[in-house]
Amino acid sequence: MQTIESGTLLISDPFLKDPNFLRSVVLICDHHGEGTTGFILNKKHQKNFNDFIGGIEHIHFPVYYGGPVELDSLHFIHTKPDLIEGGLPITDDVFWGGDFSQALLGISTGLISPRDLRFYIGYSRLVSWST
């Protein structure tokens, strides 16, 4: 049995029938005894960041569909721990979340680009169980 850890990429089976994960690549962000959490990397949402967050018209970052769980939640992964405190490490270079106001400030000042940070609506969750 293979172990899954943060930073692992899962590629969907080509014959998978679940439309949520059809032709998907999922980045595992957290894995422990109670389940696994990740984000679908390759499904861009039809709306941009400013369509979801009112009053922030100057931020035109794309948003990605992270998965079918909690579609009313906004998450982000980034490569700027020096500018965004509090992120959880996924790999040595990639972090999940952190101080949202610091992320917005970095974007507004041009220190953070779409190459450095991605927003996700919803997330993917696999729950562990035993038989």
What are these regions (language model features)?
Residues M1-Y120, S124-T131:
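A short aromatic-anchored loop/beta-hairpin motif
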